[in-house]
Amino acid sequence: MKFCFVEDHRADYPVRVLCAALAVSPSGFYAWRSRPESVRTVENRTLLEQIRQVHADSGGRYGSPRVHAALQSRSIRVGRSRVERLMRCHGVRALVARPRRVNTTDSCHPFPIAPNLLQRQFTATAPNRIWLADITYLPTGEGWLYLAAVMDLHTRKIVGWSMRDHLRAEGALAALQMAVQRQKPGPGLIQHSDRGVQYACGDYVAALEKAGIMPSMSRRGNCLDNAPMESFFHTLKTELVHHRHYGTHDQARRDVFAYIEGFYNRKRLHSALGYRTPQEIELRAA
């Protein structure tokens, strides 16, 4: 596998430098290179091209589990360990996150707190039974931009979202209104959120009541009570935001729109869905 790495990078660095870094000899590399290719080597080269295509199609976001699932969906039968080994050997890696934390929850307010109806039971038998709502932040050259989002727990689809340059309730309300207009939910829907003022204030509670939605709220300081929503925000930042430098709010809005509507909801393989897409799950449930 070390010789594979040397072969992949010899156009960029001298072979002797690469061999020294990997503690192998140049003569050993050239002897390896001059051998007739085995059937396995030819298969690996074809497979690597397919892996790189899947990885590129995901915008560099997929690691080996999702690459493997995507290959399986294309009727390419291969073991997950083989995919992982080829990706590691040839430097095909998923994007990684940069840790940073900004508090978007203000739970010091006089509004009533709804009970926690979920109790971390993150399962729903059909779409529009349980929604999750939360707010996160995006850095831009014009200051913070705040993304309010609503997720359907069954499909993991982002059914509503809104972006504002402030943390007032309008952003959360706009995301809820988009979700209601888009999904047209029936009775019995629960929406779970943190206990922030945006979700506990009178305007938001009135909007829930008008739509026939029951509110549910996390315990104080328990982000795991809304874990799937936290996971989506982590994914968004790992796969997109942490690899961008937005000069303006509009740049961030366009990029996030393309990610949510063009990639995440329609194309991204989701581990909690058995490596299927939110759109696929929604269509099956229709």
Model-derived segments and their meaning:
Residues M1-A286:
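Charged DNA-binding/catalytic regions of mobile-element recombinases
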